Amino acid sequence: MSKRVLTSVAWPYANGPRHIGHVAGFGVPSDVFARYQRMIGNDVLMVSGTDEHGTPLLVQADKENTTVRELADRYNRIIVEDLVGLGLSYDLFTRTTTRNHYAIVQELFRGLNENGYMLKQTTRGAVSPSTGRTLPDRYIEGTCPLCGATDARGDQCDNCGNQLDPADLIDPRSKINGETPEFVDTEHFMLDLPALAEALEEWLKGRNDWRPNVLKFSLNLLKDIRPRAMSRDIDWGVPVPIEGWQDNNAKKLYVWFDAVVGYLSASIEWAWRTGDPEAWRKWWNDPEAVSYYFMGKDNITFHSQIWPGEMLGYAGKGSKGGEQGELGELNLPTEVVSSEFLTMSGSKFSSSKGVVIYVRDFLKEFGPDALRYFIAVAGPENTDTDFTWDEFVRRINSELANEWGNLVNRTASMAHKNFGEIPQPGEFTAEDQALLDEAKQAYTVVGDALQLSKFKAGMTEAMRIAARANQYIAAQEPWKLAKDETQRERLATVLYVALQVVSDVNTLMTPYLPFSAQKVFETLGGEGIWAAQPEIVEVKDESPYTPVGVGLPEEGSSYPVIMGNYTEQKAIWQRTELAPGTALSKPKPLFQKLDPELAETGPEWAPVVKD
């Protein structure tokens, strides 16, 4: 029986183009997962968008001498184009500066406030002395007062896992310009997390299938849980929908309060854009539906504490009780899938320091599947990993081109040359049957890995089967059989077995490498869409949903979204038995080998930096 699977993907900031470190964390893993879920017959809703509020955009707008809205519009479009180029199969990729998003965010806030989970408190806020602008928690660094780590942030210390306030830090400094912030009294709405702690703990203790590091970190957060500010002294963001606050342009909702609501607001937008305004409830209100959230490790707290806390409070599930809001009881995350960090030649990605590889540049030179493959086999799934051009060239040449691409090309070429079609096999030998059985069993092995978000393990098994097929061909020597007319039936059998395994491995790799999977499908005589791709759709900003928002963006502006029709694709997670007599297409090389010199120099737009 099929399930409804919500795939919620972290929202990239629209303050610049995205680099490969970003998509290694939130992009490719979530897409591999969603594509696999569709192939096994589940009803997937994959949503995200650009995060367009908060200080990062204000800072970048100042640097570029433009308005923050113009900046958001520009980078929203660039990011949309890049993610489509990478083949990320969103059902809807939208943005946070829409009328719909504002209205849904404010509905959540009002529900929390009415249930008593929003506290008005005076706190100490950090301000930049040179600009007078509020500094958000994450833009302040200093020494942790609890463990002594010198790189603690104003919201938490990654070294010891404790929550912090900026004023807690020893020797605090601004990440923007290094100056010491001033701390002033300011009034804010605080999410009463202590009143939600028991409900959060009960939920977390039932998450036994999470990655151990994510679960341990999330449970540790509860040990020092405290109210957390959900408004900010800032003039760019979602208005606070409370009388006396909603018209105050100097105070807006915290960017992380509204960003996590984006998964819900995007689902609601998708529903009415596809003609069924209530369809989102199938993924959010049905307790049988499941939800998976993909992000980098620095965002775990917002997805295992803040967002679940917001949903619990909105439903009246904390210690203060309360009434359920009109959006209903919202499903808590089934799993929070966190990736570690990808670095570049040992350094953190940094646009300002030139340590960066932008997605757009990468796609233009190497194509999407090369990047998707590298992230799958060498990405930061469980530990921080390093991107080097040397490792990239080695992986592409020895694995993707030599092992997989060569298998496809030589098998299809021999079959096309000698038969022009899928040949009719004779009786299988023990060696033939062993390889066929092994390839068929791999559907279970790879599928189990993908269900648990173990992407490296899944690709490793698929490549192992490809290697076995290459060994089989080397042992059977079909090029010799082709020279002996009496071995015609054996040649047909060997090539049939090899082609069937190529088809199997191609299916196993479809979630990872959808672009090349389509080519292999067509080479084997397939017609139609094997692996569907997303597309860009221009839409108007409208908000037909019922919650009444305040201070909404102007109606009618246009913006690009990513959508796609993935229901008609032919890819399914099972062996497709090849039909003898099916015409083969003349194969073309699947992957080009890279110049070995690239490993030493890097491309012109991202050269290797010599010590």
From Swiss-Prot:
SUPFAM superfamilies per UniProt: Anticodon-binding domain of a subclass of class I aminoacyl-tRNA synthetases, Methionyl-tRNA synthetase (MetRS), Zn-domain, Nucleotidylyl transferase
Cofactor(s) of this protein: Zn(2+)
Location of the motif 'KMSKS' region: 348-352
GO biological process: methionyl-tRNA aminoacylation
InterPro entries, per the entry: Anticodon_Met (IPR041872), Met-tRNA_ligase_1 (IPR023458), Met-tRNA_synth (IPR014758), Methionyl/Leucyl_tRNA_Synth (IPR015413), MetRS_core (IPR033911), MetRS_Zn (IPR029038), Rossmann-like_a/b/a_fold (IPR014729), tRNAsynth_Ia_anticodon-bd (IPR009080)
Subcellular location: Cytoplasm
Entry's Gene Ontology cellular component terms: cytosol
Record field: catalytic activity: tRNA(Met) + L-methionine + ATP = L-methionyl-tRNA(Met) + AMP + diphosphate
UniProt binding sites for ATP: 351
EC number: 6.1.1.10
Predominant localisation class: cytoplasm
Cofactor note: Binds 1 zinc ion per subunit.
Subunit structure: Monomer.
Protein role: Is required not only for elongation of protein synthesis but also for the initiation of all mRNA translation through initiator tRNA(fMet) aminoacylation.
Listed name of the protein: Methionine--tRNA ligase
